[in-house]
Amino acid sequence: MVGLDARSTMDIDATVKGATVGIEEVENMIASIISVPVDDGVEFRVKRISEIMDEAEYPGIRISMETEFDGVITPLKTDISTGDAITPREVRYSFKLMLEDRSIEIWAYNLETVLAEKLETVVSRATTNTRMRDFYDLHILSQLHGQSIIPADLRAALIATARKRGTEKYLADAPAAFDEVEADPNMKNLWRAYQKKFSYAADLSWHTVMDSIRSLYELARE
């Protein structure tokens, strides 16, 4: 939705519907996928498969792999979960390939669910959320795709996500949480560190980011 020029990532997040997500099942699934012959010169190797334990609201399986193309080895991490509250439903997304002049279609989260998951995290975690990429993503997605957001779907997705994570009680106090987050010295320092690390955020003020997040929340209340 954003593109590599706005924020790059070496990770893939996926959710599975209608299947068990355990280490053995995922190992078999990944082995089947990477063994498909496509003759593109890319080789995938699984290095490690483990349960995700670091973030309670994102239980699932993490696959650490490396890819090799033309002698260059690149690490790749894939997180697979199940039971995410995709609201109202997943959508087909056309993804343009980097090395071929064609696109492929994938099932993806709708924009409103992507925003809802990140917005819920900002509200419920408040000043304990150290993932500045969540804040940046909310801002850039609202700037690039704001006209495409359906308020009713955003509201439904936010409620569904909070219900699944057991954080509905925090939604009513979101404005106060936003004020606390914006004023917190540690959060400001984290944002400055993020700006120094990632040039795409260098000219983006903390206040501007938080204003975008407030606007998204108000849109969800329409």
Regions found by a protein language model. Name each.
Residues 2-6, 12, 17-222:
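Structured mid-to-C-terminal alpha-helical surface segments
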